[in-house]
Structure formats: C-alpha cells, structure tokens
Design a protein with these regions (language model features):
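ALDH superfamily catalytic-core signature
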Residues: 4-6, 10, 125, 202-330
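Rossmann-like NAD(P) dinucleotide-binding subdomain of oxidoreductase/dehydrogenase enzymes
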Residues: 89-232
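C-terminal segments
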Residues: 2-15, 84-87, 248, 275-316, ...
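Structural signal for hydrophobic packing residues in well-ordered secondary-structure cores
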Residues: 14, 18-25, 37-48, 57, ...
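Short, flexible turn/loop "capping" segments at secondary-structure junctions
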Residues: 13-15, 214-216, 244-249, 333-340, ...
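Flexible, glycine/charged-enriched surface loops at secondary-structure junctions
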Residues: 26-34, 51-54, 167-170, 245-249, ...
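N-terminal Rossmann-like NAD(P)+-binding subdomain of aldehyde/semialdehyde dehydrogenases
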Residues: 1-101, 130, 271
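Short, well-ordered beta-strand elements within core beta-sheets of diverse protein domains
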Residues: 18-26, 112, 254-257, 340-351, ...
Length: 432
C-alpha cells in the first residue's frame, strides 16, 4: 500500500478494524466487552490524561476553555458508564416465554465515527465506549484541528488495552490529516456510521449507502415566563450559556421573555454576568464577517468575545456573556440562528402564548427537533410547549446544556450527540 494513496490507507485501516472485530466477537463475552469499554473510560477520565487532552483540545482548535473541557470529559464519560453499566450486550439478552421470542445481541462490525472540533476528546471517547460495549470495532474521523487530541486519546487507550491484552486495531482513526475524500471512503466502507458535527457531514452520511445515525442542528430557545423564579432562571441560563464558551449544541441561543417580567429578568441576568445590548446591528456587524461567523468571536472566553465585538468600553467589568435584544426571525436575521458564542439573543413576548409562537418560529428557522426549554412555575405550560413546537426535548427549569445531554439529577441519558428525529432530518430522536 502506498502512503500516497489516501483512499487505500482508509481501506487498509478499516480492514484491520474488521479483522480485529471478528476476533473480538469470536472470543467475546459480556465481561470482555465491558472491560474494553471501562478501559477507554479510564483512559480519558484519569486526571492527568483528562487535563492534557483538555489543554490540547483548546490549544489546537481554539474552541472552548480548559476547565470546562475537563468537566465535560469526566462528566459525560462517567454518566455514560453509569447508563450502560448493567445493559446486556452479549448473547441472549431476553427470553420471553409468553411470546416465544428470544432476543440475541450481535455486533454490527466496524463503526465509522465522524466527530467535531468542538469536542475532540469527549465525543470520540463516548463513541468508542459505545462501540466496544456492543462488540464492535471503530474508526474515528476527527476534524483536522481535532487530530492531535484524537491521537493523544488513542495513545492513552492503547496503553490501557495493552494491560488487558486487547487488540489495538479495535480502535483506530483515519491515518494522517483528515480530508473529505478520506472521510467519504470511511462512510462507504463502514458497517454503521455515527456522525456528530456539521450538517454537511450528516448529509454525506445519509447519502453514502451505509446505515447512519446522525444529529440535527442545534439552536436552543428558552422561554422565561411570568411565573418563573427569575433569579434561578438567570443563574441557570448564565451557567449553561457560558459553559465551554458555548460550544455545545445544547447551549441557549435565544431566550424569549414574557413582557410582565422582562425588566426584572434583565436585572437578574445582569447579576449573573449578562450585559444587555439593544443595538442588534452593531453585534451583527462584528459577529459575522462576509456571511460567516467571526472566528475571533466563536467559542471564545468572555474577554476575547467582548474585544472582538468592540464592546470593551461599553459593558461592565465581569461581563460573562452578551445578551442582544432583537425582533426578527429567519434567514435575514442571523441573530435568530446558532451562534456558537457567548452571545444570547433576547426576544420580548407579550404573554405566554406569544412566547410559544416566537419559539416555534425560531425552531422552524433552525434547530427543529433538537430541544427547547422553559422556566416556569405553571405545571401545564411545559406540556403546552411540547405540543406546539417541533422539538424532541423540552427542558424544564434546568440549565439547558447540563440537562439535555444527560445529568445525574434528571432522567436524560448521557450523550454528546442528540438525534433530532424527522423534524431535524434524522432517522431517530434518541441520544446517540
């Protein structure tokens, strides 16, 4: 095989993964699959490894911040391991005497995983754990900027595998620097594809001829109504919005605040570090450059964002995020979409019904099928919202980023990849 032939390199990598998987399955047991998954979990959760991976991710991608990536790597992996701990994935997993139906778990084969630069450590680790838990092998295709982090992660995984005598070829990544051509070939020759990231990659996966699990676009909108605990709502929104510099697809991109408590909520939001800007065009002119999000603003720390937006002399010291009043929704109003930054769009609604309609319009523009939220004390309103909006999840009185992808204080399963159902152009709405 010539190293000058990138397609042949991918095919050879998948061939090694397939041979390793077949041996893994032939000698398989629940204990073996579980130990392989546990080895990967420890490879990323070990404190020194976690810190190094977080630092490397921020250094090479320029996205997010180290403390929050450390938290994310640990929390998402620990939560996933809790969720799958007692799930049977080998042999007979159910034998129903009443129906005469026996269910047997069988591996799929080689999983191809496309992962984003926003989570170059946590997402591949979670994909790898899920693959091994079910007796599969996996080949990861990281974003170009995520390659160093993925390489380091695999190095830690291999060290754990060597201790257990597990074949390294069960977990591989596309060799060398990633490219569209290499990723496309991986999509074509894998047995199942898992895609987290850009909608372009999702579309390519769905047209590759290989079964695919993929995610939809996020653009979370959250209602704050007149019955809400305003202090708690502001604190939760601030914590969620700023976590890892808003790299999560579950980060609030817009809040819709009912008029009766609008001014009071703005005061509470300011106490939690949110500075309100009423000139939306000023933000638009800085946040987008030639139709694209400004790389100097996206996923940056607060001081970097504020400087990029030209607001250094216009916001209070200690400002953690920028809240921007606006009215428009749709393609001609960029603030109504996903911003991947500490910028939060603020809509003012006349009442709850108007807030629901505004949220519906936002989701129809972008983010349908993903998730919305509400801060309220009215027991009936979350259900009203759920029945009115094209969404797969309604998060109630919680910090959205922490709740949507799984939490230890709610029933959502842990994941970094949210299926968005047919509304979001996906096969399923499950947490992948």
């Amino acid at each position: 095989m010539s190293t000058d032939d990138p397609i042949a390199e991918v095919e050879a990598t998948v061939a090694r993964a397939r041979a390793a998987q077949q041996a893994f399955e032939a000698g398989g047991s629940q204990l073996l699959y579980d130990r392989a998954a546990q080895a990967v979990a420890w490879a990323i959760m070990e404190p020194d490894h976690n810190r190094i991976l977080a630092e490397l991710a921020v250094e090479t991608t320029g996205l997010g911040n180290v403390p929050d990536k450390i938290t994310k790597n640990h929390r998402k992996t620990l939560g996933l391991m809790r969720d799958i701990q007692h799930v049977p994935t080998y042999g007979v997993i159910k034998d129903d005497a009443d129906t005469g139906i026996t269910e047997i778990a069988r591996p799929i084969g080689v999983i191809g995983a496309v992962v984003p630069s926003t989570n170059p450590g946590a997402t591949p680790a979670n994909n790898i754990i899920n693959a091994l838990k079910c007796g599969n092998s996996i080949v990861v295709s990281p974003s170009p900027k995520g390659v160093p982090t993925c390489e380091a992660l695999l190095g830690y995984i291999y060290a754990e595998f060597d201790k257990l005598g597990i074949d390294r070829d069960l977990v591989q990544m596309i060799p060398g620097r990633g490219s569209k051509e290499k990723t496309q070939r991986l999509l074509e020759v894998s047995d199942l594809i898992v895609v987290t990231g850009s909608q372009n990659n999702v579309k390519r996966a769905y047209t590759s001829g290989t079964p695919a699990l993929a995610v939809g676009a996020g653009n979370v909108a959250v209602i704050v109504d007149e019955t809400a605990d305003l202090t708690a709502a502001a604190q939760k929104i601030a914590a969620s919005k700023t976590f890892d510099n808003a790299t999560s697809c579950s980060s609030e991109n817009a809040i819709v605040v009912v008029d009766a408590i609008y001014d009071a909520f703005v005061v509470e939001m300011a106490k939690s570090g949110g500075a309100l800007i009423t000139d939306d065009q000023r933000i638009i002119d800085k946040l987008w450059v030639k139709g694209h999000l400004n790389p100097c603003a996206i996923a940056r720390n607060a001081d970097e964002l504020i400087a990029a937006l030209g607001l250094t002399d216009d916001v209070p010291a200690g400002t953690q995020f920028i809240a921007v009043e606006t009215k428009g929704i749709g393609p001609d109003f960029p603030l109504s979409g996903e911003k991947l930054s500490r910028v939060l769009t603020v809509y003012r609604a006349s009442d709850f019904d108007d807030a629901v309609e505004t949220t519906r319009k936002i989701q129809l523009h972008q983010g349908a099928g993903h998730s919305v939220g509400i801060h309220t004390a009215a027991q009936d309103r979350p259900l009203t919202l759920a029945n009115a909006i094209p969404t797969s999840r309604v998060i109630v009185n919680q910090a959205h980023t922490f709740a949507t992808g799984g939490a230890f204080n709610n029933g959502m399963p842990f994941s970094l990849s949210m299926g968005c159902g047919s509304w979001g152009g996906n096969l399923s709405l499950i947490h992948i």
